[in-house]
Regions:
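Membrane-embedded beta-strand positions of outer-membrane beta-barrel proteins
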Residues: 9-11, 52, 84-86, 127, ...
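Transmembrane beta-strand segments that form the barrel wall of outer-membrane beta-barrel proteins
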Residues: 11-21, 49-59, 71, 108, ...
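Residues that define the transmembrane beta-barrel architecture of outer-membrane proteins
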Residues: 26-34, 66-71, 80, 119-123, ...
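Outer-membrane beta-barrel "beta-signal"
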Residues: 127, 263, 270, 391-405
Length: 405
């Protein structure tokens, strides 16, 4: 039996504006970029599927961001209660909004965005077993992918260039160290629960200041860790309770605990711009209207969600990441329209140093094949937080228009 290719993808144009000049070598305020990605799936037979997901980007200023990467090239086989995946794949774990502590399989593609949501493909052998007692997974990860970083002309700029040529590893095997991960997930009543164990090279590098002939740079060092953790989400009507926790340690990493926990409450239909539609002309609230303003006015049900999360790291100021004692408060709007319009406004407050990060993400579909996304981040009071001081001049607004095919 013939199995046709399933071919889909998108082409996007991105435009960014930075309100202040950077301390980098190229003090531009505007940046443009073009990207394309394709997802191809082909069923070789009823049990075996081939998946390919290439991605390419050209950036106006940052050479490190102009590249071609393979996010997935995976052979997936399903037999009874078993699934085997071999090749380059992408795996996501986590339930919280602000930070996913348990999401450790894939490396962050940091040249794409600052929210750590974009990932590089990971070479893997993944075996899953589905049972009445949950889903059991095992991973063998034979090659490590180094984190990408923006170049000296890239923005947002760290304040000092990361030189990947100076990368070191705790493991004598370098990027060839064999990492191992185990995971169990199960649903119990209102809760979805996940447990994991990881032994291998930590994806988050330690960035060490190093002097070179051209001045100071940051040299990445990747450490070996053993990590155990859990993630859980409970749904009680309109209330979602979320939590992630890890215990992590190694020869060069002090044994410590990190956690993110919080809630999200959704008021369904909390905002209804125009309940009395008889006040409007007869042709306004037709189901097929394409006018975005009319869609907003005529919407019967706009859901309002409130998000609250607490982030904690036992190491405090000695941690190599900024979320040691922080609070996230956010508002999510879901317009429930045919354009799937949504928006998320979030504020992260450092409860020790006083730094504040305000972010906005919003998107809507235009016509049948286009989607417009807007993202903005503003940094306040960064002087008291060493990990955020570099972003003092890096507040930005970004618009992305994508065509899907």
């Amino acid at each position: 039996m013939a199995h046709p290719l399933d071919f889909r993808g998108n082409i996007s144009s991105e435009f960014s504006y930075f309100g202040r000049s950077s301390v980098g070598t190229d003090n531009f305020n505007f940046n443009s970029s073009v990207a394309a990605e394709v997802e191809v799936t082909h069923d070789l037979n009823d049990n075996i599927r081939l998946i390919a997901h290439p991605f390419a980007r050209w950036d106006e200023h940052d050479d490190e961001r102009s590249r071609f990467v393979l996010r997935e090239l995976l052979l997936s086989a399903n037999f009874s209660n078993w699934e085997i995946n071999a090749g380059v794949g992408t795996v996501f774990w986590g339930v919280t909004e602000s930070r996913q502590l348990v999401d450790l399989i894939n490396q962050t593609d940091a040249v794409e965005a600052t929210d750590n949501e974009d990932k590089l493909g990971q070479l893997m052998l993944n075996v899953k077993w589905f049972s009445d007692y949950g889903e059991f997974e095992a991973f063998l990860l034979p090659r490590f992918e180094e984190r990408t970083f923006k170049g000296p002309n890239g923005r947002p700029f760290l304040g000092i260039t990361v030189d990947r040529d100076l990368t070191t590893f705790e493991s004598a095997q370098g990027d060839q160290h064999l990492d191992v991960a185990l995971r169990w997930t199960h649903s119990v009543d209102a809760w979805d629960i996940g447990l994991h164990y990881f032994d291998g090279t930590l994806r988050d590098p330690l960035l060490q200041v190093t002097q070179t002939d051209t001045g100071p740079v940051l040299a990445p060092r990747y450490l070996l860790v053993q990590q155990a953790g859990w993630d859980a989400q409970g749904l009680y009507g309109d209330l979602a309770v979320k939590t992630e926790l890890i215990v992590q340690g190694g020869d060069e990493v002090d044994l410590h605990v990190e956690t993110v926990s919080g809630i999200e409450y959704t008021w369904v239909g909390a905002l209804s711009p125009m309940q009395e539609k008889e006040m409007l002309p007869d042709d306004w609230c037709t189901p097929d209207t394409r006018n975005p303003f009319k869609k907003l006015i005529c919407n019967d049900r706009i859901d309002l969600g409130l998000v609250l999360e607490y982030l904690w790291d036992e190491r405090g100021e000695s941690s190599n990441q900024p979320f040691q004692n922080d609070l996230l408060a956010g508002v999510r709007l879901s317009f429930n329209d045919t354009a799937t319009t949504d928006a998320l406004l979030g504020l992260v407050q450092d409860l020790d140093g006083g730094a504040t990060t305000l972010s906005l993400e919003a998107s809507t579909r235009l016509f049948e094949s286009f989607r417009l996304s807007v993202e903005s981040t503003k940094f306040f009071n960064t002087g008291g937080d060493a990990s955020l001081q570099a972003f003092e001049n890096e507040s930005y607004i970004k618009a992305d228009l994508s065509y899907f095919f």
